[in-house]
Design a protein with these regions (language model features):
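Domain-level signature for soluble enzymes in the chorismate/prephenate branch of the shikimate pathway
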Residues: 1-359
């Protein structure tokens, strides 16, 4: 059973007219105010989701903006806006979305392939990465015992990451669009005999009582998130990420009490050490040995390939595109692109950014 998902409505960008200069001035003033308040960053799910943890860990004083799903994150970043804020909010309707944060791989469940497809579809770039520890608990409305639970809700990925624990009892497992969304569902329904698999922070946000903690199969389970942005916005987004790293290191804690011990310092230290990562996507020519020659060209440049992922091509049946992560700075990535040119029919460099120490 899948909980119903809300759909976002995109707000059209205003066109240019005779008063465009005045609007541009007003927009610049809003952008200046936005910079002081921190960037608006879209994430999938509800407050308390692991994606929100990633936003809070990666940025300095961000304003997380929840949207229903991964596609909506990409649409919000591409359009630069989301639906009007809730009544009483001080958020400006036309205040831009600076970036989005999406999961790309987990130590237990592997690659989130949908987000590779969406990244290619929406022509965004990768401005950074952040690795978030995944600690799961089982939580329910206050006053219930674990013996009384009959139904357990969560995102399918979280259910898989807690499979060993969940198999110890004859519970009915029900999927929701998000871990924090499972908590919201239980609270809104006032549902007894039901529990959610989610983070301890999400349980606290929704007023749930933890029945079992640390239920993830892998004790040091982690999820790697990508920070995505429009190409013209990426430099500003990266500057916020670097400031977040320095701030976290100086204060010894992350924004809103989210630990960034494995995130903030890594951005600062890895960038200072010159350890950079480049994400690219390519399609090889339909000739014998093309992929082999591409991999050989990368090896001859002395570049470490930390990830190679294939996805079906959207243009031709039974052909594939390859997603590659290289430990390479911008100059090394450009050299790799030149070396790959003769054996590829398509190649896009999607971003070069400081590599997380845990990524």
């Amino acid at each position: 059973m899948t909980a119903s998902r809300r759909r976002a409505t995109r707000q059209a960008s205003p066109g240019r007219g005779p008063r465009s200069a005045e609007r541009d001035s007003q927009s610049a003033e809003r952008d200046s105010q936005s910079a002081d308040r921190g960037p608006r960053v879209a994430f999938s799910g509800e407050p308390g989701a692991f994606a929100e943890d990633a936003v809070l860990a990666a940025f300095e004083q961000p304003r997380p903006v929840p949207v229903p799903g991964f596609r909506e994150v990409f649409e919000a970043v591409t359009a630069g806006c989301v639906p009007a804020p809730a009544p009483g909010s001080d958020e400006a309707v036309d205040e831009p979305i600076a970036a989005g944060v999406v999961p790309i791989e987990n130590l237990v469940n592997g690659t989130v392939r949908e987000n590779y497809d969406l990244l290619l579809e929406h022509h965004l770039v990768v401005a950074g990465e952040v690795v978030v520890p995944v600690r799961l608990c089982l939580a329910a409305l206050p006053g219930q015992s674990i013996e009384a639970i009959e139904r357990v809700y969560s995102h399918i990925q979280a259910l898989g990451q807690a499979e060993s624990f969940l198999r110890t009892r004859p519970w009915t497992l029900l999927t929701t669009y998000n871990t924090a969304g499972a908590a919201k569902l239980i609270v809104e329904r006032g549902e007894l005999r039901a529990a959610a698999v989610l983070s301890p922070r999400a349980a606290a946000l929704f007023g749930l009582e933890i029945l079992a903690d640390g239920i993830q199969q892998v004790a040091d389970n982690r999820t790697r998130f990508l920070v995505v942005a429009r190409p013209e916005s990426a430099p500003g987004v990266r500057s916020h990420l670097r400031r977040a790293a320095a701030s976290a290191a100086a204060s010894g804690s992350g924004a809103r009490s989210v630990s960034v011990a494995s995130v903030g310092p890594s951005l600062r230290e890895q960038a200072a050490a010159g350890v950079m990562r480049t994400t690219m996507v390519l399609a090889v020519r339909n000739e014998p040995g093309s992929l082999h020659r591409c991999l050989g060209a990368i090896a001859r440049l002395g570049l470490n390939m930390s990830k190679l992922e294939s996805r079906p091509s959207r243009d031709r049946a039974w052909e594939y595109v390859f997603w590659i992560d290289l430990d390479a700075d911008e100059a090394e990535a450009a050299a790799a692109a030149r070396a790959l040119a003769t054996d590829t029919s398509m190649l896009r460099i999607l971003g070069t950014y400081p590599r997380s120490a845990d990524g």
